[in-house]
Amino acid sequence: MAADYWSSTQHQSWLFGREELAEARKVLGDAERPFIQQYPLPDLRLFNIYVNQQLIKLAKRLNVRQQALATAQVYVKRFYTKVEIRRTNPYLVLTTAFYLACKIEECPQHIRLVLGEARGLWPEFIAPDSAKIGECEFWLISEMNSQLIVHHPYRTLSELQSYLSLTSDEIALAWSVINDHYLTDLLLLHPPHVISVMAIFIAVVFKPNQHQVVSISGGSSATGALRDGSTNILSAFNDKTGAGMPAKVQRIVDWLANSDINIEAVIECTQDIVSLYEVWEQYSEKVCKEQIGRYVKSRGLDK
């Protein structure tokens, strides 16, 4: 087990460049071209939103803490960099990822209990056989090369709270943004500390509009606030004098300028979150469920 991120398998094996990640998905798509054409799926970000919402439903039924849920989201993301979605039953994959994450995060759940709750949520897609979860668990572990320890941005957020004098409201908003980043590719593209700094910046820069953003990710008012605020962040970094900048924002900008953190990466992450919230406005749970269910049933992946 790696005690720190920089010596971890997460840093060494599960951090991609954008082009590298796009190429990996293209290779998977080319190999499954007939099925992709036959069974269209929504935008990957919409698919991620749907999977995330199903995971949240399962976690609530079992009263599992956020970190285990986040680890499950990471497992699903990693798995789907190696396996094309249409080769799988996403309901079984997310159930198995959740079961495995609970073990790794030291809040284990009995396999039959997880199976029972999953069947309660998706009876038409989860077979009444716990061996299916066991088989899928082996598949996940194999595709992830047994590299199961995940470092999350929450720790950095907690460490910076007192140093940057963050209020409880700012911490709550930053936490919410971190939760939402698991719906994007950011967890495969940037280290956790960059994600945490991005979330802090959003929380502080958007403070006048935070009731819009924290209410829930993806609302149109939140999207507008974030879009406007991303311009504020760019202005903050480009303003060398700090004129007209709130004191806390200036302090964070100064701290960041004197750190080793990649400012361009923080800005890029902010733009990805804005993009997520824009896409979220198009989300329809009904459409996603129908499209996923169609290929799962047609290919017999629910058996």
Swiss-Prot record:
Pfam families, sorted: Cyclin_N
Record domain Cyclin N-terminal: where: 55-113
Broad class of the protein's primary localization: nucleus
Keyword terms, alphabetized: Activator, Cyclin, Nucleus, Repressor, Transcription, Transcription regulation
Gene Ontology, cellular component aspect: nucleus
InterPro entries: Cyclin-like_dom, Cyclin-like_sf, Cyclin/Ssn8, Cyclin_N
Entry's localization field: Nucleus
Gene3D superfamilies linked to this entry: Cyclin-like
UniProt key word Zinc: no
Domain of life the protein comes from: Eukaryota
Molecular function GO labels: cyclin-dependent protein serine/threonine kinase regulator activity
Biological processes, Gene Ontology terms: regulation of transcription by RNA polymerase II
Assembly with partners or alone: Component of the SRB8-11 complex, a regulatory module of the Mediator complex.
Family named by the database record: Belongs to the cyclin family. Cyclin C subfamily.
Record's function text: Component of the SRB8-11 complex. The SRB8-11 complex is a regulatory module of the Mediator complex which is itself involved in regulation of basal and activated RNA polymerase II-dependent transcription. The SRB8-11 complex may be involved in the transcriptional repression of a subset of genes regulated by Mediator. It may inhibit the association of the Mediator complex with RNA polymerase II to form the holoenzyme complex. The SRB8-11 complex phosphorylates the C-terminal domain (CTD) of the largest subunit of RNA polymerase II.
Protein name in the entry: RNA polymerase II holoenzyme cyclin-like subunit
